[in-house]
């Protein structure tokens, strides 16, 4: 039986922390869908199409990872993808309460949907897309935290 997992997020933009999580998930499951949420209410810096393209480039070396955009409820998307596993990253204890609420709601909506929590390696445990964008807006060097293609796209966006 093959296992298919979904790693959802806004990925605005995708960071090395996200790449760390999806790489480890790809070694655990037969197929991983990197599901990029449209999230218009978050007013993303990058369009959905841009985020998909950046993520596809950054994960091209992972043969069992597919990047797909979505705008539906996660449980509905998981059902449509015939996936029963959600991958979520936990950076700190502060993330846990919110992630637990999401996991319970997703399980209520789709009882067979299990959430699997992965912690990023220590090097990436403090970064978020929001923090990276904020530092970059103030001319801070964020190249260490992003795949090269994403770093260049961020610099271009901020010109």
Swiss-Prot record:
Its main location: cytoplasm. InterPro entries: Cyt_trans-like, PPAT, Rossmann-like_a/b/a_fold. The keyword Nucleotidyltransferase applies. Pfam families: CTP_transf_like (PF01467). The gene is coaD. It is an enzyme of class 2 (transferase). This is Phosphopantetheine adenylyltransferase. CDD domains: PPAT.
């Amino acid at each position: 039986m093959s296992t298919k997992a979904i790693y959802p997020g806004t990925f605005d933009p995708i960071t090395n922390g996200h790449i760390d999580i999806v790489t480890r998930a790809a070694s655990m499951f037969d197929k991983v869908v990197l599901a990029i949420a449209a999230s218009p209410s978050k007013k993303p810096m990058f369009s959905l199409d841009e985020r998909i393209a950046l993520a596809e480039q950054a994960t091209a070396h992972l043969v069992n990872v597919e990047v797909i955009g979505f705008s539906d409820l996660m449980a509905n998307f998981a059902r449509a993808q015939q996936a029963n596993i959600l991958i979520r990253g936990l950076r700190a204890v502060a993330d846990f309460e919110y992630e637990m609420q999401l996991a319970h709601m997703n399980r209520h909506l789709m009882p067979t949907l299990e959430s699997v929590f992965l912690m990023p390696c220590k090097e990436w445990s403090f970064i978020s897309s929001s923090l990276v964008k904020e530092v970059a807006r103030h001319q801070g060097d964020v190249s260490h935290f992003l795949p090269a293609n994403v770093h260049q796209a961020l610099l271009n966006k901020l010109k």
